[in-house]
């Protein structure tokens, strides 16, 4: 295996293959941990009669510097926060998508929207940045999925957030909608 990037480290092919296998195993462990936490959060919500928000976004949206502490704002309103990757595997997406579902993140997002649509105490807030080209397709599709279940779609464009005042109003409106629907 001739990889010039690693030449100075003198790794053998066997060492590189072993490292890749260990990395894949750890990645699977990480994904399983996320799913376990999602199930624990849902159980906690049910046990304590709480409502929750699935905060769906790209991995970099979990960075507090990027998301401006939206997760903290939501929990401060008495709601639980879950991520789309913590619940997407529980979905049985039967909704007919009008887009080609070829990207892992998009597939996870559609599955999460479908799962949220079937839950009475969950809503989904989609975080988006920079008007990302391929992500633009997801906003319409996620909205359609949620609306097919009578749920309100909330999109927060992270790069347009200067302060959390407007976000707070949107989340409170979503919470009021949840209570009204109950």
Question: What do the PLM-derived regions correspond to, one by one?
Answer:
Residues 1-182:
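An N-terminal assembly and electron-transfer interface module characteristic of large anaerobic redox
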